[in-house]
Amino acid sequence: MPKLRSATSTEGRNMAGARALWRATGVKDNDFGKPIIAIANSFTQFVPGHVHLKDMGSLVASAIEEAGGIAKEFNTIAVDDGIAMGHGGMLYSLPSRELIADSVEYMVNAHCADALVCISNCDKITPGMLMAALRLNIPVVFVSGGPMEAGKTKLSDKLIKLDLVDAMVAGADSNVSDEDSAKIERSACPTCGSCSGMFTANSMNCLTEALGLSLPGNGSMLATHADRRELFLEAGRRVMALAKRYYHQDDESALPRNIANFKAFENAMTLDIAMGGSSNTVLHLLAAAQEADVDFTMADIDRMSRLVPHLCKVAPSTPKYHMEDVHRAGGVMGILGELDRAGLLHTDVFHVAADEGGNLKSVLAKYDVMQTQDEKVKHFFMAGPAGIPTTKAFSQDCRWPSLDNDRQEGCIRSREFAFSQEGGLAVLSGNVAENGCIVKTAGVDESNLTFVGSARVYESQDDAVAGILGGEVVAGDVVVIRYEGPKGGPGMQEMLYPTSYLKSRGLGKACALITDGRFSGGTSGLSIGHVSPEAAAGGTIALIENGDRIEIDIPKRSIKLALTDAELAARREAMLARGPMAWKPIGRERFVSLALKAYAMLATSADKGAVRDRSKLED
């Protein structure tokens, strides 16, 4: 029978000093011997997705203590990618994922915690905590802050739904009046919560449900809705149940590595493809798989992308639906139910929402709105927006008049009526990206599934933005932004501003953009990221020159630079002849701190999840 990890610091006379310190935190005589449950919160007033999390740890703690545990909360950092976007702050976003993972590991291992609840929400926080949870391999439950309500405003007497990307595009579009731009800006992000579309934060929170590590509704229940309170309480109860199964019954199915196994990673990626999730999720799933020692690679993602249909279309791929609409249609469990009926889901995997001995199949039987007989579950998924600006969680209890069970023309479709039989993400490869690259096909217009254009090369995102706004980029160009990968940036910046500015200049469907950087979950259009190997690692993207012909064929999963092998070899020799300046950007002025340099020294390319290169750390 496994011994409580916390016994290391709570048992024996030699631990008298540690017990004295535990007592100073409020632990009583009769508490020693109970499991110590760490609560990793990420409250901050910098991020709308986290501004309402201050009291959530106490809520979880109350359920843990009622179930017989000791709850101890700590906090970790959270970067707002939208606020950090478009300037040097974005260099810190992806590296913060590793810091979050390390900080959770440090706190949990330093204090010998027995189990963990992760209160996350936005872009790098959920992945960082996920990496830590799989690294630690102790019982864990994830519970996020939830999505914000979609913005709504009237323009030209027409009510429209909005999100962050609409504000960015309108702000850069000279055809939009100052009055309308300000109106959109003030309405785009009306409440606390993660941005309202299927951007990175919401995508990752949905994927934790598919991985089996969070409760149904975690990815879709609005941050403002009173029903979300129960998710936090149930997370506390569930983690205690998992801890008892592991420490009292020696049941290893309660451990995250046995829940998030290879089949679960396939389920998560299947969901991601079906719902047209953010391309960043590929990066984070690859990183999490490495922490779990699961052999899940770009090859698996490529294989799955050819099989899974696009069943759920949400902003930024359409203005019609946001996360509040996904929830009304049954949330993640609704999508998983359709995937199961299509024969595309592993249902024999463990799940934290399953009762002891249960699995995903039993969870779907209860929580898939198309098959459940539980009226409480149906009531749960009818939770809707109030349309009142607020930064407070649980501040409203509005309901939709009915569920969206329309699987033919609704937000979630059956396989027969899929938005497309091709999924929402695709892996492309070719001489531009020998180890692959990612495109969010859910956001690509059908007319752009094949594209041939001339390269317009930039050595940084800043130069690309200046070029786009300055009129250098014209219809038919393939904008190439390089040296923005994990190592070359460093930090693999998101390219939401370049894609937004292309849209604002009417070039959203007339140009392509490829980069060794990445894209915000808010990006749509022919935007191809994660080019691997990156420029700084000797990738072919570093050898592209202005005017080169680039051929993109999404149906054939191909991206090709129209040069012969001999021509490429000659360019590579010329690059190597630059000596110490080889594989470095020409003329880029950028301050890179020591912290970022340390990250860059160990960073792998995107096809490996941009994680640390373990080979450089082995003895």
From Swiss-Prot:
GO terms for cellular component: cytosol. Coiled coil: none annotated. GO terms for biological process: isoleucine biosynthetic process; L-valine biosynthetic process. [2Fe-2S] cluster binds at C122, C195. The modification N6-carboxylysine is found at K124. Mg(2+) binds at D81, D123, K124, E494. Pathway: Amino-acid biosynthesis; L-isoleucine biosynthesis; L-isoleucine from 2-oxobutanoate: step 3/4; Amino-acid biosynthesis; L-valine biosynthesis; L-valine from pyruvate: step 3/4. GO terms for molecular function: 2 iron, 2 sulfur cluster binding; dihydroxy-acid dehydratase activity; magnesium ion binding. It catalyses: (2R)-2,3-dihydroxy-3-methylbutanoate = 3-methyl-2-oxobutanoate + H2O; (2R,3R)-2,3-dihydroxy-3-methylpentanoate = (S)-3-methyl-2-oxopentanoate + H2O. Its EC number is 4.2.1.9. It is an enzyme of class 4 (lyase). InterPro entries: Dihydro-acid_dehy_C, DihydroxyA_deHydtase, DiOHA_6PGluconate_deHydtase_CS, ILV_EDD_C, ILV_EDD_N, IlvD/EDD_N. Its cofactor is [2Fe-2S] cluster; Mg(2+). Binds 1 [2Fe-2S] cluster per subunit. This cluster acts as a Lewis acid cofactor. The active site is at S520. Keywords: 2Fe-2S, Amino-acid biosynthesis, Branched-chain amino acid biosynthesis, Iron, Iron-sulfur, Lyase, Magnesium, Metal-binding. Pfam families: ILV_EDD_C, ILVD_EDD_N. Homodimer. NCBIfam families: ilvD, PRK12448.1. Functions in the biosynthesis of branched-chain amino acids. Catalyzes the dehydration of (2R,3R)-2,3-dihydroxy-3-methylpentanoate (2,3-dihydroxy-3-methylvalerate) into 2-oxo-3-methylpentanoate (2-oxo-3-methylvalerate) and of (2R)-2,3-dihydroxy-3-methylbutanoate (2,3-dihydroxyisovalerate) into 2-oxo-3-methylbutanoate (2-oxoisovalerate), the penultimate precursor to L-isoleucine and L-valine, respectively. Belongs to the IlvD/Edd family. This is Dihydroxy-acid dehydratase. It comes from Shewanella sp. (strain W3-18-1). The lineage of its organism: Bacteria, Pseudomonadati, Pseudomonadota, Gammaproteobacteria, Alteromonadales.
